[in-house]
């Protein structure tokens, strides 16, 4: 973490390891006072403290957002076609809240998933995002499950450059610790003390490529919270859990751990107009991608901070805009467009998206993408529709432009469970499609083999064992298919679905970066008789 100003241009310079295994970043040190306070608090036993009492007149505003996913520019909300977000608008709205009453302390918290989901995030590995969040005054962020998608070393650099701490009390790394804190106590002169404990979803270890989580372990969050909360609670006015676990785990946490005043959540991309109450603990979440800003106000009553109001502030065309940040975003976007010609890998042969191939039969391109998805999610099976492959990737040097032309739809991976019966139904639908129509719904697969005979499914196996209709299989697919696209209504019955936040295009970029030269081929996983 860097408390010193660093220019965005400097921060976006190439980041290369040097001979001794360290990185070529400048040496920076110095920690805000409230972080040192935090470290002392976690070390002291709970019995040494008595609960702090706020003073009459004390007030506080908490602002929060989550699941930013690199969305620097405004976007169209698919739910209502409204233009939302844009970090220049988000920053100006935060500043507007602060200006309403300069004497009232405002704490800004980010509930995780800074990375993964836009061209600029992929190209610049999150550096513009972390720098601009610092400029808008984020006080603390929880580590999301996508913070390791570009590798541990990238996350370490981002943490060093950030003007705010990343938190996660339940994530550990061996042998080298990750640059995260368990918690912070935010203390400002004359203001209530706010303890913030960070918790990350256990899905961290399955939602990114296995190489990104080498040496990483995730402890059960309820046990961690029970262990650490008493010391934080005893000398603060408000205890906040900054969670990137999703609403189900947040509910379980609220019901299982006493002493929590508020849970600020993320991971589901849910939008709650009012807090969800569990055991009188409010749980809040503010959608995704900076489209909304949550605001909770507190006032001291009878020695305790009491919630007085909650609102979701829309970030849209009616919002103010920070002109300096808007100009910075425009420059970053232009830089990204220039970067599209950058080479990310090498292809030994063309990956063809010819309709007469990828929509009719097994294709090397389909195998490559489906295998990547199954590998990084540890799924049993991967399913992708041939219509999702929009352009071929030529042999030779592979550029970012060629990958984005092949996958322009911004589809993301969805991981869930499907019964064997429904998996077979999906394969039956694919088999029944007339190949002469070049059907976009024809399935490219990984982890299984299926045989088509006279427009019918003649067999389907996983590891030479027939698919068991009663068994549950872990399946990864696109959000398009998971929503029943191309007539695959049976995939809507997927249980425990997780929107991974990982775009197919980003996955393919990472695949070329790490596996080049790529020599995809067919292996008779799909056969027609």
Give residue spans per PLM region.
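Cationic, low-complexity basic patches in intrinsically disordered or flexible, solvent-exposed regions
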Residues: 29
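Hydrophobic membrane-targeting signal helices
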Residues: 41-45
């Amino acid at each position: 973490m860097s408390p010193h100003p660093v220019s965005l241009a400097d921060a976006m310079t190439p980041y290369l390891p040097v001979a001794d295994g360290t990185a070529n970043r400048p040496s920076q040190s110095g920690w805000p006072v409230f972080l040192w306070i935090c470290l002392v608090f976690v070390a002291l036993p709970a019995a040494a403290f008595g609960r702090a009492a706020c003073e009459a007149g004390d007030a506080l505003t908490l602002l929060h957002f989550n699941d930013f996913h690199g969305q620097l520019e405004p976007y169209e909300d698919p739910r209502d076609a409204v233009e939302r977000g844009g970090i220049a608008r988000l920053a100006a709205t935060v500043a507007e809240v602060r200006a309403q009453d300069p004497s009232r302390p405002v704490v800004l918290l980010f509930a995780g998933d800074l990375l993964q989901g836009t061209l600029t995030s992929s190209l610049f590995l999150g550096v513009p995002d972390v720098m601009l969040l610092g400029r808008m005054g984020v006080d603390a962020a929880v580590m999301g499950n996508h913070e390791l998608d570009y590798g541990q070393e990238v996350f370490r650099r981002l943490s060093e450059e950030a003007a705010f701490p990343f938190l996660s009390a339940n994530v550990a790394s061996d042998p080298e610790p990750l640059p995260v804190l368990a918690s912070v106590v935010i203390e400002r002169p004359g203001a209530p003390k706010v303890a913030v404990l960070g918790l990350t979803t256990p899905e961290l270890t399955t939602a990114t490529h296995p190489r990104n989580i080498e040496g990483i372990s995730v402890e059960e969050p309820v046990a961690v919270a029970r262990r650490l909360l008493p010391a934080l609670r005893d000398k603060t006015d408000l205890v906040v859990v900054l969670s990137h676990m999703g609403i189900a785990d947040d509910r379980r946490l609220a019901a299982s751990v006493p002493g929590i005043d508020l849970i600020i959540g993320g991971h589901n991309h849910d939008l709650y107009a009012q807090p969800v109450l569990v055991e009188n603990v409010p749980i809040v979440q503010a959608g995704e991608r900076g489209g909304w800003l949550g605001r909770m106000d507190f006032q001291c009553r009878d020695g305790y901070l009491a919630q007085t109001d909650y609102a979701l502030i829309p970030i849209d065309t009616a919002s103010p805009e920070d002109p300096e940040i808007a100009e910075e975003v425009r420059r970053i976007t232009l830089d990204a467009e220039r970067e599209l010609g950058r080479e990310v890998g090498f292809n030994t042969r063309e990956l063809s998206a010819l309709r007469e191939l990828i929509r009719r039969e097994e294709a090397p391109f389909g195998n490559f993408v489906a295998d990547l998805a199954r590998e990084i999610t540890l799924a049993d099976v991967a399913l992708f529709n041939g219509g999702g492959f929009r352009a071929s990737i030529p042999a030779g040097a592979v550029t970012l432009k060629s990958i984005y032309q092949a996958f322009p739809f911004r589809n993301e991976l969805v991981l869930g469970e499907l019964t064997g019966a429904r998996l077979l139904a999906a394969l039956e639908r694919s088999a029944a499609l007339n190949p002469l129509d070049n059907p976009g719904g024809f399935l490219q697969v990984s982890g299984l083999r299926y045989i088509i005979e006279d427009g019918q499914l003649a067999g389907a196996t996983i590891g030479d064992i027939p698919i068991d209709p009663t068994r549950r299989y872990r399946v990864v697919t696109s959000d398009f298919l998971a929503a029943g696209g191309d007539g695959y209504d049976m995939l809507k019955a997927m249980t425990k679905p997780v929107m991974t936040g990982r775009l197919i295009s980003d996955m393919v970029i990472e695949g070329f970066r790490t596996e080049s030269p790529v020599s995809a081929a067919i292996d008779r996983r799909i056969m027609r008789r």
